[in-house]
UniProtKB/Swiss-Prot annotation:
The lineage of its organism: Eukaryota, Sar, Stramenopiles, Ochrophyta, Bacillariophyta. One of its GO terms (molecular function) is translation elongation factor activity. Residues 136-139 are annotated as: G4. Residues 10-214 form the tr-type G domain. Residues 60-64 are annotated as: G2. Mg(2+) binds at T26. It is found in: Plastid, Chloroplast. It comes from Stephanocyclus meneghinianus (Diatom). SUPFAM superfamilies: EF-Tu/eEF-1alpha/eIF2-gamma C-terminal domain, P-loop containing nucleoside triphosphate hydrolases, Translation proteins. It catalyses: GTP + H2O = GDP + phosphate + H(+). This is Elongation factor Tu, chloroplastic. Residues 174-176 are annotated as: G5. The gene is tufA. Its main location: plastid.
Amino acid sequence: MGPEKFARAKPHINIGTIGHVDHGKTTFTAAITATLANDGESFAKAYSDIDGAPEERARGITINTAHVEYQTRDRHYAHVDCPGHADYVKNMITGAAQMDGAILVVSAADGPMPQTREHILLAKQVGVPHIVVFLNKQDQVDDDELLELVELEVRELLSTYDFPGDDIPICPGSRLQAIEAISSNPTLKRGDNPWVDKIYALMDAVDAYIPTPERDVEKTFLMAIEDVFSITGRGTVATGRIERGVIKVVDNVEIVGIGDTKTTTITGIEMFQKTLEEGFAGDNVGILLRGVTRENIERGMVLAKPGTITPHTNFESEVYVLTKEEGGRHTPFFTGYSPIFYVITTDVTGSIDQFTADDGSIVEMVMPGDRIKMTAELIYPVAIEEGMRFVIREGGRTIGAGVVSKIVK
């Protein structure tokens, strides 16, 4: 018997956790799923389930590393955990680009860390529209005034990066206390335990504060490929979030970017081990492709309706260059500068050929804090189009964020 069908009964929201690695993001996700499971809305996920990818792959077309699903009374959530290792920022950029909102996890015992600042900044750059804060480790803070102080610090930090710091819900709690309470009594319901209730309060805030986005279902289908793997006897699977449009089994799609463009047919679509007849904008899906080998396709390519997007190397863009205080460069850069461009799920080196100031004059040098028009050339072709956002990085730091304004070639 194949996987069950996915029931589209509630609005689907993509959410994620961001924050300092040691502030307990992953066990925090386990706390949410375990809590909501007792509301009859979700299945509990153990910590090992959330951080483990290879075992999941044996079960069908599954989604990258740590996509977990859960439901509240009003919504269906896909939750992406940005992994906390060397690839963190790369995954944060691709993961955050898929988020309709994020839960920022901050330790109430430690307050905001240097990474917290970078993660809020990245969330702003890649366009995470809404943030709710979970102040973890409340059980380690005896002093209410200290808790208020940390809350104030977090609000100020969010306001610094143009999030509405005064309005954002901040929910204190302890993911460890919640998990321990549920482990010792798996039947705990809302109202039975103060620590578990704090997780409910957080998800109530997420339900209320993060709006249901309008999905681009009218536009032509596009999905950036986040991961690729093979299933013996079934073929090759590409996973990612559908950026726009609708896709059905047996539709033809093009694989665009990096190498030559290829056409293939979709033979299956799944979300969380459940089959879909069609995938909609906003869905995190695995798409099974006919006649495609693992060598033909890689992260950074896109699947698209045939003839709707083409690979390019040269484009004009409008870019904001971060200041030193925002975590950017301390010094100017010049034409010929070759940073890394993060476009949807791709990271590719490019050289900057020309800078143009707002008045149309050509400039040789760009300072941190400048807003500038620039022409860039990537070392290999990537599926890009006007209006696409990107982030520019070098040496482990974000130095700018921009939008493609014109395709040159």
